[in-house]
Amino acid sequence: MGFSKRPLIKKNSDEERIEWNEPLQAGELRKSQIITTFGPGAVVDLEKFSGIIASADLWERAYKNSNQQKRIPESAKIHDRNLEHLLGVRYFLAPKTMESNKNSSNHLSQDVYAFRFPYMHFCPACGRLDVYWKLGSGDNDFTTCRHCGKKHKLIPSRFVAACINGHIEDFPFNWWVHRGKTQLDHKLKIRFNNTSGGLESIIIHCDTCGKERSMEGCMSANALRGYKCKGKRPWGGKSKEVWEKDCIAGMHALQRGASNVYYSVIRSALTIPECRDPFYQLLDDHPELLKLYQEIKKTPAVSMTGLLGAINSDLKEYLTKYGLCAVKEKFERYSAAGNEDYSYEKLREDEYDAFCGGDNKDKNFRIETSAVPEAFTPFFKKIVKVHKLREVMALVGFRRVLSLDPSDANNQETEKLKAFNRELHPMGYIEPSIKKTEWLPGINLYGEGIFFQLNMETLDKWAAIVRDSGRYRAMYQRIPAGSAMQKVFSEPYVLLHTLSHLLIRQITQECGYSEASIKERIYSTYPGRVKTMAGVLLYTSSTASDGSLGGLVRMAETDIIEKVLKNMLDQAKWCSSDPLCIESTTQGYNSLNYAACHACALLPETSCESFNCLLDRVAVVGRHDETGNISGFFELGDLGSAAEDF
């Protein structure tokens, strides 16, 4: 990441600004962090300064400047046909890196840029508060205060202002201290009282007029009412050309390191092999062939045959064997299939079919069926060892202030979200690139896991009992209208999701992985769709191409997984918060959990795909007391010898 060494002050009509050249190494981030926590538009404390990660379209320039052809090399592009189809892009692009050591898994980024942000800094010696290029002097680090002359590292402002449309700027200290009026030429100072550590101890003082005001109350919902958003997008640079005009959203004061400054929006897919025509598989592996065909398809037949045959030996063989007409028909069918609507539901259904379809030895999808323990055959149809998988993770955008999609808001949030600009951001999030690109930021993750397919006959029997009881009717009614949770909710989903959490908590006690390192994918029949699903994938993944070490896969051995399942059920019967937990139907966000709390079923947020919602231990183990008689899934079959352990 970098910013320029030499400052060049330029005058604008209403402010001074600074331009930079000659990149300076500012700090280091892991490649996966740039796709998740610290993606384009995120504010991050780097080694050299506090900065905002630059727009992703700058990655393209970095790649093109690194080779004589001035284009992104094919080796840098990440392909996953299903995810490309879903998101409407041609490929995914990882942050440009260099290996620090051939024998090391560490990678250093050379071409991911960051701009210094926030602009407002203060001198720890005299307290002067101003934009850093006016306040400090120095070759590139602004270590000398122009006001007091003392050499100190300037400290970036703790506060920023942002709106739900993604715009972010310096907190308006001048406007704040003058209570709604901006006095451009007034000089500000900041001081800290030692009376407490709260916001009331931070005092903003105007040297020019003598007014002062503490920061107490600046974080309240209406603190910046009357302050108009300027549409600033500093991750695109300081030029006003990247500002968005006429934003009507209210501004909110945030602390620059707070989680609500940046919520990344991630989409991912597992790379699964397809039982496809070998010609279509060739086009999957070499997407540049389709691009070439589209460019030359109107040329004369002789010229087209020569051009296509020259670029790829396999394609030349097809032309020789089947002729140009047959090959053109294949190209057209492949192209038409790529233009069909493809949904996230279909993507999950394709993944589910791949896990249920038998053993596979594909380089990115190596699975092996493991025998289901005899005691658990009424409940599980299949248990699969996932020796290797590849997950393509893409950053599709980000949000500020609120994490939910504008359409997912509950009644308390509706007022804030009325100003979200759907015209500019139709998907409900801010895109990672300011300039339109044909790609999205993405990375490959490799790992291992275990897949559990439930017995559909037992599941249907349990679901019918629970549905008749109406146990989850209130849970469904509490889900925000139009939200992702509403789109997946069903009685089986609650069971599968809870089972997944309980299994992860138990497996981490047996295999040494932490809960945060294991993720879940729930495969449950989507409401309104014909395809039936009932499965859970637990997996771990990392950017290392060799994946992980096999510890999780080993848990799928028949004798080991039998022990894990027995212990899981034993643990699930009791919670340290019982009887309050087991009797509860109003826990968690929006009361979307029943018998599930931190002591028994909740996981780190990185592990859960539904924000630790839609959980209920009773779905797994049942509950029988004077207040209710509710059957759990694992009570519907004969556990045989397993029952002796309970």
Task: Say what each PLM segment does.
Residues 2-177, 187-193, 242-646:
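Extended, well-ordered protein cores
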